């Protein structure tokens, strides 16, 4: 989302497509940390994977969305950091909730749909594919598929859930403006109020493009809050992703993020200012999956920074959920045929947590 909020990218030969797992919190979270103990050191590095690099292709950076509640003039001294209890390894396979807990989430969603579950099936960890040093032994459930007559409900081991509408039609056209998209989301919020269960919705939409210029629009909503920190958490961890049908007045599927329910709060960590983070970025102190050959030979300069925001990395491949300043940097032209006017932006991260709490600062090559 995020809301690009949270993201993995395909190889450059395919379209640069930001993947967001979205939704709402369905079960309680947080056990308070021991305030008498010192905050443990954190590892700010993260796995890039083998799926290319994080980036966007846009005609204008404004198309990336503006619903992030963080602003540069926001005064934040600390932000919470969480241990991801569903983490297994760099593959991101989520294993934490019991089979009964997975079923409980599915039953709750079915009740909001006024539907009865008629079949269930659990996907389990294959012992032959376990990575070294994993905490798993094999056979653990990492996903539940629950079917009703009209819906298929998928619940992952970290609480994330997807509802697929078995009667879905053709997906809604991606070629919509931001205002058209917001109107569509408003219609869906009214029609599916019981399922979506959002009291104070913040509507969020953004798009990116394929190399040929085909627009790919995303539709999201999250719960507003008067507390700025809680609103930041809602934006990063509690998005609801909507896929409209062709008419725009019905849903093809909806996704709910719930991973914050499978965490332990480590503590509230002091964070650096955005100005300090930007200085680190310009000094080359950043984390990125962008290959160096795509960056201009002069490195990152002020005029290359197209967008700045504060986010949490929330994918299940992360052992720790911690905040980062994220920067979108305009990359140099690549040797790939692209639609006229289309620009490539690479994503660069600077940890928001103060350096004295990072074990790997400042070496992140």
Where are these regions (language model features)?
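Preferential activation on post-signal-peptide N-terminal prodomains/segments
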Residues: 27-233, 260-262
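Single-pass transmembrane signal-anchor helices and their membrane-water interface zones
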Residues: 1, 8-33
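Segments that shape or occlude catalytic/ligand-binding pockets
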Residues: 182-336, 342
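C-terminal soluble interaction/assembly domains
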Residues: 319-323, 333-365
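Alpha-helical interaction segments
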Residues: 11, 60, 316-317
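Short linear interaction motif-like sites in intrinsically disordered regions of transcription factors
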Residues: 7-10, 71, 207, 365
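Short hydrophobic short-linear motifs embedded
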Residues: 2-6, 56-59
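Short, solvent-exposed coil/turn segments at beta-strand boundaries
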Residues: 147-150, 155-162, 215, 242-251, ...
